[in-house]
């Protein structure tokens, strides 16, 4: 019969797969502008085994919204946010939020993000007809000296409810709770980099592997005890 340690260890295999996937996804987005790393919160399998819990451990994933480093690009349509604000983009499924500001213009000169989604201003989609484009800290967009719109910057009372969609988009289950990000500023000609620290992720991966190896030992130990028990019964 499997004891509590082995039951927990078996469950940990599935958890380790999810954790490894999370780490791999973080590492693959080290160079993705505005990417926010996922953090796996894993209840140690060894701790559970020592306490003889019957249930396998729980692991949850949360998003780290710590800012990435600001990188100067010199591109007039690259925008970085200083503060806790988000850009708004329009998708076929509704409004989404992002920190990734590597924008461009489509054939109709509508401001779009890297995925081709329209970036929203206070008046809706932003069309930029002109040559000299200036974006001020408060989001005001001037084309050839004339203000055409102001980029919508919003935030939420808490970011815990935001859900990832793809690599750099976020969905809010309660978009009505968005408020103007008055304390945030836009920096033109710059991008916010990913907040992934490759060294930290590799250390997390090593820790995950150590937990995996510990699980192996627990299961092997239990199998050895089972084998001995069967042999003893066979001698009776």
Residue ranges and their predicted role:
Residues 1-236:
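Amphipathic alpha-helical polymerization modules
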């Amino acid at each position: 019969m499997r004891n509590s340690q082995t039951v927990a260890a078996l469950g940990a295999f599935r958890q380790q797969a999810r954790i490894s996937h999370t780490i791999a996804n973080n590492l693959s987005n080290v160079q993705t502008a505005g990417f926010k790393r996922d953090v796996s919160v894993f209840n140690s399998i060894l701790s559970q085994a020592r306490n003889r819990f019957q249930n396998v451990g729980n692991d949850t994933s949360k998003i780290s919204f710590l800012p990435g480093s600001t990188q100067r690009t010199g591109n007039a349509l690259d925008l970085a946010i200083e503060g806790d604000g988000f850009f708004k983009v329009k998708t076929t499924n509704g409004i989404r939020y992002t920190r990734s500001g590597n924008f461009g213009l489509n054939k109709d000169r509508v401001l779009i993000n890297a995925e081709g989604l329209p970036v929203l201003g206070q008046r809706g989609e932003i069309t930029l007809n002109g040559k000299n484009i200036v974006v001020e800290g408060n989001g005001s967009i001037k084309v050839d000296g004339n203000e055409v719109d102001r980029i919508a910057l919003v935030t939420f009372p808490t970011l815990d409810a935001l859900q990832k969609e793809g690599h750099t988009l976020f969905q809010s289950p309660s978009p009505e709770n968005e408020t103007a990000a008055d304390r945030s500023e836009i920096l033109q000609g710059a991008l916010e980099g990913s907040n992934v620290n490759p060294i930290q992720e590799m250390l997390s991966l090593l820790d995950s592997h150590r937990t995996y190896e510990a699980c192996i030992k627990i299961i092997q130990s239990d199998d050895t005890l089972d084998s001995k028990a069967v042999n003893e019964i066979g001698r009776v």
